Amino acid sequence: MKNKRKKYFYDTIEKENIDWHEHKNPIVKLFFRLKFAIAIRYADLKKDDLILDFGCGDGWLKKILPDYNIIGYDIDPKLTEIKDYTKLKPDKIFALDILEHMKKREIRKIIKSFKRMNPNFKLVTIIPTETWFWRKSRKLLGLSETVKDHITKLKDTLQILNEELTLVKKINFLAVTHIAKWKK
């Protein structure tokens, strides 16, 4: 019985391009949808906002917000809608589950580029906490406790963000994810 349940709930092995928002495990699916819902609420979106989805991946944000002007940028040329995101003047920028994949100097460079693009922008971030609870949660899902391509820890990322921007509000969602809104 345990193996059947494990297969049903944890049949996804860690690999690139997992669509977490449509995951077979209903708990995983709910978690990813809820944290994105919080991020969207934090953004206080308006219909006339120009929104940059930085690190858009498969464009899930645009799929769930079709009535908004969202431009997706990703380093994968197959996924990006714009080659040079710095040409935009976005009102809102989402960097959801992406900053931890970058080196500290890259994060700082990107935040500085955001500040040059529009002095009045708002940034919404989602960053995994990578705490003991986060690691054990991953293990329960049949995944490795660490992610090989997570380069920068939450503490270091927050230090950069606090040096470059002003924190508007934050929440540590279920102790595994840090969601925040920032302004210049």
Could you say what each language-model-derived stretch is?
Residues 128-148:
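Short, glycine-/aromatic-enriched active-site segment of Class I SAM-dependent methyltransferases
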Residues 75, 98, 127:
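Hydrophobic pocket-lining residues within nucleotide cofactor-binding pockets
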Residues 1-88, 92, 108-111, 145-159, ...:
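Conserved N-terminal segment of class I S-adenosyl-L-methionine
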Residues 95-98, 107:
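A short beta-strand submotif of the Rossmann-like class I SAM-dependent methyltransferase core
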Residues 101-102:
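A short His-aromatic
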Residues 105-109, 135-136:
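Generic recognition of short, well-ordered alpha-helical segments
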